[in-house]
Amino acid sequence: MIAIFLFYNKTNGFQSIFSTKGIKHCNIICYDGQDFVIFGLEEHGISFRRIKAKSTLKIMRNIKVIESLIGMIVVHVDEPKKITWKPFWVRSCNELCRYFSGVDIGFTFNPYHLIKKLLKYNNKRNYQVLSVWSRNNGI
């Protein structure tokens, strides 16, 4: 599975008070071989939408026009880790991204912590980082 982690410098959620380094929010696009689906934490719950695109490269190129997007990490997940859903434990954007992708990195406190763990455990767990992009050294 391909997972594209997207990081933003704007949000309207209260969890942003725990964010650091100007990285306030994240969401994820997953590709399972048939469909691209974007998942995100919205004000009133979890949202997901199918994206019609011919390739991961097209999505990466076109999504960069979003002004608040400051970084992107693309990973290939070999075998998604089965993570027990704990809805009352944490409902943050970074944890939802971790759940949906199946990356084996353990708990993440905020989007910045998610970035650090994705880069730290590259090729050491169940995924490989394929690409890292940032706007003005965003990540």
Spell out what each predicted region is:
Residues 1-139:
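Cysteine-nucleophile amide-bond enzymes
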